[in-house]
């Protein structure tokens, strides 16, 4: 999938909407029958990605929430659990659509009271598992769906994954994906929920990264916390992604030494592989010393 303009290795599982399609001959139209995706169906699909060797991924993207808060929490926590067990990817999750929008179908509207939206987001996301291998955001953006010729609200967790992929492409994984430079949300008309400064501060203390529309700047990811619930170096996205990068590289180097003699020559060969890599990370501002 294309993430915020960049390609990434990811998995997105969501529901299926009823959509009107035109036949190839444009003679008639038909409506796709409903195929409600249950939480059990989604979890069964996610379970495939517990196999770290068979399915390498960088991001596990939640997509939309489910029909109820409990199911939304279950979906998010399953992704977080997989990412935490794999320890080589990041789960990107967010609130349910009903937390910030009212009405169902193709034309939901934002809730009038932003304090209610804030309370709803907190009620949902506070139940998400604490993990440095997950990122929570607050956003739903309004986009034009060119495939169905209509406007619709979609979650911004795929944009956050795209920001991380874009940061790796244009900078390095240990740079923060947030802010006016690297944290811009593309292809968005407006937000369903644009938190005030007081609301942003409240969300941020609860591990939720606000997605904010600033006049003259656009829509921006205005936070770089992981879903870790306590103070740690790993409560920042860039620190977790730095270690993902370093740990993966060192693991590959160590795997190449399997079944070799456990002697000075083997250890020296390992050091010769790892030291230049760490010096390169140091030169690019990832670490200060090693």
Residue spans for each PLM region:
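Structured, hydrophobic secondary-structure cores that serve as assembly/anchoring elements
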Residues: 2-290
